[in-house]
Amino acid sequence: MPQSTLPKRQPQRRSQVPSSVLGSVTVGLEEFIQSQGAESQPVLSRAGLKPGLYQQPNRHISLKNYCNSMHEAARATGNEHFGLWFGEQFAPEGLGLFGYQAITSPTLRDAISGMEQWFHVFQRNSLLNFSSSGGICQ
């Protein structure tokens, strides 16, 4: 199996900057909240997010607030699996180049390797690792 010739990105020291994620993760969130029976604006507001973040897909938003939006949406809709259902219907293309790299990779290994390599662009102050040993991926 071909190995990447690019140097492996080393984890950076933990900084005082809060973890963040690209606003593209909110593509379709408002509509999905409403399709599950809740009003999106109050849900996002309680989570510390503003409506329309999907219109600025390259802007970083607080990861904590994004995770809170999943909890608030689950509570507001009564669907304890809200986050899973949102993720299931989310199109990877919505993640921009990060998602496009994953879906156009020739193998799953290449997709995960590319995601690991470029994760720091998509999500800041977070870590994603992938390793395989004896045919088992971790």
Language-model features and meaning:
Residues 1-138:
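N-terminal low-complexity or simple alpha-helical regulatory segments
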